């Protein structure tokens, strides 16, 4: 009864080849993504570490004196794009590393 219902929905008889081919194609795509992920692991770890340091620095920029008025008038993020602000400038540079020119997230306008 179940087989007849499935055949009716698809308009043709199912066989193992269709299912295997689909599963194989999905496995190939998965393997490709896994390889890309492994290849980018070192860069991604570096980016996470830089972001962690930058987030800490953002919380204390005024207290540490790295982003004080009047230089931070438009914000410490903008100041870090213009001059060296510890941790934040490094994070902004690393964000674009390994990416195409127009895919640098928040930094797309100042990197080129």
Curated annotation (Swiss-Prot):
InterPro entries: PSAN, PSAN_sf
The protein's role, per its UniProt record: May function in mediating the binding of the antenna complexes to the PSI reaction center and core antenna.
Bilayer topology annotation: Peripheral membrane protein
UniProt record similarity statement: Belongs to the psaN family.
Keywords: Chloroplast, Membrane, Photosynthesis, Photosystem I, Plastid, Thylakoid, Transit peptide
GO biological process: photosynthesis
Name of the protein in question: Photosystem I reaction center subunit N, chloroplastic
Species this protein is from: Zea mays
Pfam family, one: PsaN
Taxonomic superkingdom: Eukaryota
Stretch forming the transit peptide: 1-27
Name of the gene this protein is made from: PSAN
Subcellular location per the Swiss-Prot or TrEMBL entry: Plastid, Chloroplast thylakoid membrane
């Amino acid at each position: 009864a179940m087989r007849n219902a499935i055949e009716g929905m698809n308009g043709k008889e199912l066989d193992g080849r269709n299912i295997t081919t689909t599963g194989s194609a999905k496995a190939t795509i998965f393997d490709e993504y896994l390889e890309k992920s492994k290849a980018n692991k070192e860069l991604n770890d570096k980016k996470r570490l830089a972001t962690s340091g930058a987030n800490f620095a953002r919380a204390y920029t005024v207290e540490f004196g790295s982003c004080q008025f009047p230089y931070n008038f438009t914000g410490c993020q903008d100041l870090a794009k213009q001059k060296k602000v510890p941790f934040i400038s490094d994070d902004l540079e690393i964000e674009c590393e390994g990416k195409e020119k127009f895919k640098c997230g928040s930094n797309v306008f100042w990197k080129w």
